[in-house]
Structure formats: C-alpha cells, structure tokens
C-alpha cells in the first residue's frame, strides 16, 4: 500500500497526537515562524521525523495548490476499517450515534461530514467501498483533524451492514425530500444511525428501503436541497440536541 500525504496544521497535529508512528518525513515552509507550527515541528523532531525545508512554490506544488499552512507530511496509511470492526466500535458506546453516507464521492463533502461527525460525537461514519470518496490529503485537510479521530468504516454491502446494525438494536433513519415528517418531529435519541444520500441523487433504492424511517429537513426557500455536509450537520446536531434534552 502506498504512502499518503497530509497537509495543514490540524491534520498533522491529529496524527501526531494519535499515531505518531505513521510519520515518515515532513516538509515545512522555509523560514516560517508560526506560533501554531513551531510546537508541531519540535514534537516531530522529538519522535525522530526528518524535516525538510522547502520553498513556498515547492510546497504549493506538493499540495496541488491547496492551503497547506506551511506543512506537509508523508505518512504510512491508516488502518482501513471494515464491517468486521463495527461490533467492537459499537461495544464502546451505550447509545451510539452513527452517520451513514451513501454515494458521497466528493472529497470536500466527505471531509466536511467527518468534521461534523467529530463535533457531534459520532461513534463511526460508514460508507460503501464502491460509492465513496477515497481518503486523500484533501479529505484530511477539510476534516481539520477529524479524519484521524472519527472511525471511517468502508463496507462491501451497505444494505447488509444496515440490517446488521438493526439486529444490534440501532434505529436507522434516512433523509429524503419526499418524507412525510421532518427531523424536528422525529425521535432521534437512543442507538441511532442517520443516512445521508448523495447530493442530487439521494440514497440508492435498496438503502432507502432498508431504513426504518425517512425524515426530511424542512425547506422554506426556493432551493430544494442542501449540500450533504450542511444537511448532515443539521441532522446530527438535532440528534445531539434531543439526546442532551433527554438526559
């Protein structure tokens, strides 16, 4: 498996805190004095990571023009989680909150959804292997460290995985514009998985049919839908609100 690149202060910090053994080397902007960056560089050196100073143009080229904040790191790939890891993840949570993404293939959207999931205390994000954005430096950067903290589980058969979750007592709600009730009318407490479909196409038919319930976000304006990362944030934090209120 090939090595990966991560860039940006948040992404590098997250790996450094959780899995420092993954670092191979780091590239830093020559002459940069940054109060947020210097502690990271010191810690990288303490764990034996080689630092190479580079010009801004060289770093920009390595990051393909994205905002690298003066640091890029080459790391060993993270362990890939699959359906066999789900039971261990669920066992760590009394009432797990899960996010299922069906067909989210844009890396910016996946990264933003991971960031939402981290903020909402989601136990895991579940995606299908064949219809999801791969883990890239862009996903990691947009996630601001959440790609390194939130378990991302890639499954072979999403509908089968959903049925397994249901057997474990997890209620699964899918988001769909044609749903008859909205997220503010739905009960989003207890062991719960929220399913978000691809922007435009929504959930695939079998995914939709496997859900226990369908809900929608009430829309008062002219647009008919929201970006999937925005929609996931709204749904997750309505679930968080209800869960806090029920304590």
Swiss-Prot record:
Assigned GO CC terms: cytosol
Major localization class: cytoplasm
EC number: 2.1.1.185
Binding site for S-adenosyl-L-methionine: 197, 217, 226
Keyword terms: Cytoplasm, Methyltransferase, rRNA processing, S-adenosyl-L-methionine, Transferase
Compartments it resides in: Cytoplasm
A molecular-function term among this protein's GO annotations: RNA binding
CDD domains: SpoU-like_RlmB (cd18103)
NCBIfam families, A to Z: PRK11181.1, rRNA_methyl_3
Function per UniProt: Specifically methylates the ribose of guanosine 2251 in 23S rRNA.
Protein name: 23S rRNA (guanosine-2'-O-)-methyltransferase RlmB
Phylogenetic lineage: Bacteria, Pseudomonadati, Pseudomonadota, Gammaproteobacteria, Vibrionales
Gene for this chain: rlmB
């Amino acid at each position: 498996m090939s090595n990966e690149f991560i860039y940006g202060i948040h992404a590098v910090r997250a790996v450094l805190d959780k899995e420092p053994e993954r670092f191979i080397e780091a590239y830093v902007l020559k002459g940069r004095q940054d109060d947020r960056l210097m502690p990271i560089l010191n810690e990288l050196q303490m764990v034996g990571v080689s630092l190479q100073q580079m010009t801004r143009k060289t770093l920009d080229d390595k990051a393909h023009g994205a905002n690298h904040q003066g640091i890029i790191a080459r790391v060993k790939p993270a362990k890939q989680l699959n359906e066999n890891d789900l039971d261990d993840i669920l066992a760590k949570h009394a009432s797990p909150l899960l996010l299922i993404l069906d067909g989210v293939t844009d890396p910016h959207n996946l990264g933003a959804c991971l960031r939402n999931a981290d903020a909402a205390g989601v136990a895991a994000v579940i995606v299908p292997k064949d219809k999801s954005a791969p883990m890239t430096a862009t996903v990691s950067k947009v996630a601001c460290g959440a790609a390194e903290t939130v378990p991302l589980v890639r499954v072979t058969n999403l509908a089968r995985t959903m049925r397994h979750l249901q057997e474990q007592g997890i209620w699964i709600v899918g988001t769909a514009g044609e749903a008859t009730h909205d997220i503010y009318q739905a009960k989003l407490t207890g062991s719960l998985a929220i399913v978000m479909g691809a922007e435009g196409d929504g959930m695939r038919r079998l995914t939709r049919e496997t859900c226990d319930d369908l809900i929608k976000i009430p829309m008062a304006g002219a647009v008919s839908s929201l970006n999937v990362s925005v929609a996931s944030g709204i749904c997750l934090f309505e679930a968080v609100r209800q869960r806090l209120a029920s304590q």
